[in-house]
A protein has these predicted regions:
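Active-site rim elements
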Residues: 148-153, 258-263, 284
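Short, structured patches in soluble enzyme cores that scaffold and shape functional sites
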Residues: 179-183, 201, 213-217, 229
């Protein structure tokens, strides 16, 4: 008897049962988050929600940001670029702010592969295969980031908030921040997926935005962030239905549909920043020679609490 023919239906039933169980848990424990994750993948739903928020939000004069650590900002132009290209590049942190964040990172305990059971005093100077613990691909400071007064100031920076509010069409709700290292450690596709090093898109709200800053110099050997221009809209219907499970699709298949010519690798010196609509296909590429340290700050239109803790990432 062919055992493969028996095992295949069993696997399908197991996956179906597991899906139903997780759906039930999500619907009963966090219904708002559960429904958002199911509905926000569809562009027509996101557009409808954005229209409602735009109608209910009082007009604000935020075309120019004042008293920002980022200097003078043309918020309208930044938001317009994100709407067409999925991302805006060109923000710049002052070097004293970069140094404050580096000092924080070098004196604070991080967590290997975002595992709270694997604390590590990471400095980014460790030699792969020598100083780093086994299988260390990333090291995130997770909740310890709340100890950084510099990060807290950036979260409330008038310029950053103005960019977020203009793009969102609503008052920006801070969802979370993260500082993390990515190390030049080769991995298989499963490990790359766990480290967000394959093309995927996020579903953290109906409309949300992320601001990134490199805290070390990043070139093509340091694992630059990459995105596929314009893919926050016009996704293949199959990819809308799949949602975050698009991370299981090979990058080659994603590029075959959306075009390799639309891939943008973001390189820059320490302090360089960019703003992205995370509904576009994006990834952190795998470093090949040097580690990368990056700060990200996220805002949305709804307050779900610590959504990343709920979702386990």
């Amino acid at each position: 008897m062919n055992t493969t023919l028996i095992q295949y239906p069993a696997k399908i039933w197991y996956k179906l049962a597991n899906y139903c169980l997780k759906s039930y848990q999500g619907l009963t424990q966090e219904p708002r988050v559960f429904l958002m994750r199911k509905l926000a993948r569809f562009e027509i739903v996101r557009d409808w929600v954005a229209m409602l928020f735009n109608r209910s939000t009082k007009p604000r004069e935020i075309s120019r940001a004042k008293a920002s650590v980022l200097g003078n900002l043309d918020v309208n132009a930044i938001a317009a670029t994100i709407e067409t290209d999925s991302c805006y590049q060109g923000l710049q942190l002052p070097q004293d702010v970069v140094q404050e964040l580096l000092t924080f990172a070098n004196s604070t305990v991080g967590y290997i592969n975002r595992d709270l059971n694997r604390p590590w005093p990471c400095k980014g100077t460790e030699k792969v295969g020598v100083d780093l613990p086994e299988n260390t691909r990333v090291c995130s400071y997770m909740s310890n980031i709340e100890k950084s007064s510099t990060v807290k100031k950036l979260e409330k920076d008038p310029g950053i908030l103005a960019i977020a509010a203009k793009f969102l069409g609503a008052e920006a709700v801070h969802m979370g921040s993260e500082i993390s290292w990515s190390f030049p450690v080769a991995g298989n596709v499963v490990q790359q997926r766990e480290a967000a090093q394959v093309f995927h898109y996020d579903l953290d709200d109906y409309r949300f935005i992320k601001i990134f800053f490199y805290l070390t110099d990043v070139d093509m050997s340091s694992g630059p962030h990459a995105y596929i221009r314009g893919t926050h809209n016009g996704k293949k219907l199959k990819h809308q239905f799949m949602g975050t499970r698009c991370a299981s699709i090979n990058d080659e298949k994603i590029l075959e549909y959306y075009g390799v010519q639309n891939v943008v690798d973001v390189c820059g010196k320490a302090g360089f920043g960019f703003v992205e609509n995370p509904l576009c296909f994006h990834k952190g590429t795998e470093p090949t020679a040097k580690p990368r340290l990056m700060l990200q700050i996220e805002y949305a239109i709804n307050d779900y609490g610590n959504i990343h803790e709920m979702l386990g990432y």
